[in-house]
C-alpha cells in the first residue's frame, strides 16, 4: 500500500504558509489505518524496551495499538492540568508562546527503556520535551517512531543521538 497517498494536505492551515498533513483520512480508511499501525509495529519491534510514550493527542492514537500488539505498557504525556495524580512537567516553546507538558510522576521507573510514538515529526521540538520528561524520571529513550516525517523541516537534526524512525517521509511542502 502506498500510505503516502492516503494523507490529505490542507494548505494554509492552521495559518498561512503551512502545509498541514491531515491524518484523519488514514484513520477513517480501515485498511490504511491497519497498515499504519502494522508499519509502526514493524519499525520498533526489534528494539529492547519496556514502555511506549504516547504524546497528546495523536500519539495516543498510534501509541496505544502498538503497545497492545507488542505487549508493552503505555505512558501518556498530557498538557498541563489534564492528569489527575502528581506530575513531572517541562515547559517548551511554541511558535506563539510557551506551553507545559506533564507525565505522572510514577509513570516511568529509573532505568526503564522507552520508545516514543507520535504521528508526525516536524522540527522535533515537542519530542525533545517528551525526552526531557522521560529523562527526568530516570528513563532512557531507546527509539522514537513517527507515522510521518517532514524531512524538509530537518527535525531529525534536532534529535541527533536518538534512534529516529518513520513510516512515511514528505520531502517537500506543497506550498
Swiss-Prot record:
GO terms for biological process: adenine salvage; AMP salvage; purine ribonucleoside salvage. Keywords: Cytoplasm, Glycosyltransferase, Purine salvage, Transferase. One of its GO terms (cellular component) is cytoplasm. Its EC number is 2.4.2.7. GO terms for molecular function: adenine binding; adenine phosphoribosyltransferase activity; AMP binding. Gene3D superfamilies: 3.40.50.2020. Pathway: Purine metabolism; AMP biosynthesis via salvage pathway; AMP from adenine: step 1/1. Signal peptide: none annotated. Pfam families: Pribosyltran. InterPro entries: Ade_phspho_trans, PRibTrfase_dom, PRTase-like, UPRTase/APRTase. It is an enzyme of class 2 (transferase). It catalyses: AMP + diphosphate = 5-phospho-alpha-D-ribose 1-diphosphate + adenine. It is found in: Cytoplasm. Disulfide bonds: none annotated. Homodimer. Catalyzes a salvage reaction resulting in the formation of AMP, that is energically less costly than de novo synthesis. PANTHER family: ADENINE PHOSPHORIBOSYLTRANSFERASE. This is Adenine phosphoribosyltransferase.
Amino acid at each position: 500500500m502506498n500510505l503516502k497517498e492516503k494523507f490529505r494536505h490542507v494548505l494554509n492551515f492552521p495559518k498561512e504558509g503551512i502545509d498541514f498533513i491531515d491524518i484523519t483520512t488514514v484513520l477513517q480508511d480501515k485498511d490504511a489505518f491497519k497498515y499504519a499501525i502494522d508499519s509502526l509495529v514493524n519499525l520498533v519491534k526489534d528494539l529492547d524496551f519496556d514502555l511506549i510514550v504516547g504524546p497528546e493527542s495523536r500519539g495516543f492514537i498510534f501509541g496505544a495499538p502498538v503497545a497492545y500488539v507488542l505487549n508493552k505498557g503505555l505512558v501518556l504525556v498530557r498538557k498541563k492540568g489534564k492528569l489527575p495524580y502528581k506530575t513531572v512537567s517541562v515547559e517548551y516553546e511554541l511558535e506563539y508562546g510557551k506551553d507545559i507538558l506533564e507525565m505522572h510522576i510514577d509513570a516511568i521507573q529509573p532505568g526503564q527503556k522507552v520508545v516514543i510514538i507520535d504521528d508526525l515529526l516536524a522540527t522535533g521540538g515537542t519530542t525533545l520535551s517528551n525526552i526531557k520528561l522521560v529523562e527526568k524520571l530516570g528513563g532512557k529513550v531507546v527509539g522514537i517512531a513517527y507515522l510521518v516525517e517532514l524531512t524538509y523541516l530537518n527535525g531529525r537534526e534536532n534529535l541527533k543521538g536518538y534512534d529516529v524512525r518513520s513510516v512515511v517521509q514528505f520531502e517537500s511542502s506543497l506550498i
